[in-house]
């Protein structure tokens, strides 16, 4: 019996019919706290990694090796005043930051950490993740409009166009995963990647979706960078043009909530990419399968997040027209063509996804 089963059985005996509700709340709280800690130290890792790329040390003053820097940053933001522009729409202005964070947290309900370790193992998990993650664009538009600022509204309009443009390509990439796995359940998608010729010979990583669906994987990940408005797709903020985009009139914790949502969405994109294309909790080689699955998932997510940071430190910002051209004239045709190719592939004698 696993640790979770032991806790579940003991709690059921102690609290009776109230236990399922209490257990669900405890799991949600644990996941939320872990995500917040991950965001705090992801920001530190980003600053450290970019510092090393610049031949600098990065943050190293607060605590040993700078490990307490995230706590200092949080305290600083908590103590700052939330200043509201006089011309802003009060309630919409305050609701917008909350609306960005809530969908980012909600997606984690369906992401499996390892076999049988998921908050809600729903059959339409992939559809749920896509639907919930697309809600964030409304909060960005709301923030730009409620601030009653031309700069903020311009940033919000850019964000809306950019996010909608790349969601279409991401959607087609996920259709390919649905076609090959035959399920919208994220746990079943991971299980579908554990079969095949290479998996049968102990080389699991060659059976994952990244290899046969490589164009979709590349499109999904780059579109994820654009969806989170990260460099080189950060024309929404565009420091040299419109300063901070839709966040220009926010301060204190209201400002911090936008960045919290951005970094949570980075982790979500990486976790979904690892789940859909990199085998989720599956070990790369069969002889390593004794290591808990959550270790492999965390390792894959960490690697993808490091790519996010590497891209930020390496590439210059694209012009707005270049971003639109990439989404509509490159990524969309590539994913549509690959859907057709995989469809014919699955109907041919060379079908590698036969269960």
Swiss-Prot record:
Substrates-to-products reaction catalysed: a quinone + NADH + 5 H(+)(in) = a quinol + NAD(+) + 4 H(+)(out)
One function term, GO molecular function aspect: quinone binding
Swiss-Prot/TrEMBL keywords: Cell inner membrane, Cell membrane, Membrane, NAD, Quinone, Translocase, Transmembrane, Transmembrane helix, Ubiquinone
Main location: membrane
UniProt-listed PROSITE patterns: COMPLEX1_ND1_2 (PS00668)
Membrane topology value: Multi-pass membrane protein
Enzyme's top EC category: translocase
Pfam families in the cross-refs: NADHdh
EC identifiers of the protein: 7.1.1.-
Gene Ontology cellular component list: plasma membrane
Biological process terms in GO annotation: aerobic respiration
Keyword Metal-binding part of the UniProt annotation: no
Transmembrane segments annotated in the record for this chain: 25-45, 91-111, 126-146, 170-190, 205-225, 253-273, 290-310, 330-350
Compartments it resides in: Cell inner membrane
Annotated family: Belongs to the complex I subunit 1 family.
Protein purpose: NDH-1 shuttles electrons from NADH, via FMN and iron-sulfur (Fe-S) centers, to quinones in the respiratory chain. The immediate electron acceptor for the enzyme in this species is believed to be ubiquinone. Couples the redox reaction to proton translocation (for every two electrons transferred, four hydrogen ions are translocated across the cytoplasmic membrane), and thus conserves the redox energy in a proton gradient. This subunit may bind ubiquinone.
Assembly: NDH-1 is composed of 14 different subunits. Subunits NuoA, H, J, K, L, M, N constitute the membrane sector of the complex.
Name this protein carries in UniProt: NADH-quinone oxidoreductase subunit H
């Amino acid at each position: 019996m696993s640790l979770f089963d032991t806790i579940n059985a003991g709690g059921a005996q102690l609290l009776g019919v109230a236990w399922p509700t209490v257990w669900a709340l405890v799991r949600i709280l644990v996941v939320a706290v872990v995500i917040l800690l991950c965001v705090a130290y992801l920001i530190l890792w980003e600053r450290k990694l970019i510092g090393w790329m610049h031949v600098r040390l990065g943050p190293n003053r607060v605590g040993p090796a700078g490990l307490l820097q995230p706590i200092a940053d949080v305290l600083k933001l908590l103590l700052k005043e939330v200043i509201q522009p006089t011309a802003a729409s009060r309630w919409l202005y305050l609701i917008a930051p909350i609306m960005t964070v809530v969908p980012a947290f909600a997606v984690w309900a369906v992401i499996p950490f390892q076999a049988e370790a998921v908050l809600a193992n729903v059959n339409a998990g992939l559809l749920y993740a896509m639907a919930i993650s697309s809600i964030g664009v409304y909060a960005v538009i709301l923030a730009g409009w409620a601030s009653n600022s031309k700069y903020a509204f311009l940033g919000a309009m850019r964000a809306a166009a950019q996010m909608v443009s790349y969601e279409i390509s991401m959607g087609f990439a996920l259709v390919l995963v649905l076609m090959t796995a035959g399920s919208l359940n994220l746990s079943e998608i991971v299980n579908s990647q554990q079969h095949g010729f290479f998996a049968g010979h102990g080389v699991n990583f060659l059976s994952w979706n990244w290899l046969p669906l490589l164009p979709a994987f590349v499109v999904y990940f780059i579109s994820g960078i654009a969806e989170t408005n990260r460099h080189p797709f950060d024309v929404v903020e565009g420091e040299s043009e419109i300063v901070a985009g839709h966040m220009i009139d926010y301060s204190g914790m209201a400002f911090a909530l936008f960045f919290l949502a951005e970094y949570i969405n980075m982790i979500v994109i990486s976790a979904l990419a690892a789940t859909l294309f990199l085998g989720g909790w599956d070990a790369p080689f069969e002889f390593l399968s004794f290591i808990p699955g959550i270790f492999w998932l965390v390792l894959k997510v960490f690697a993808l997040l490091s790519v996010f940071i590497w891209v930020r430190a390496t590439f210059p910002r694209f012009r707005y027209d270049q971003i639109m051209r990439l989404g509509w004239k490159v990524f969309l045709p590539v994913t549509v063509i690959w859907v057709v190719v995989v469809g014919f592939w699955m109907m041919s004698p060379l079908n590698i996804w036969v269960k």
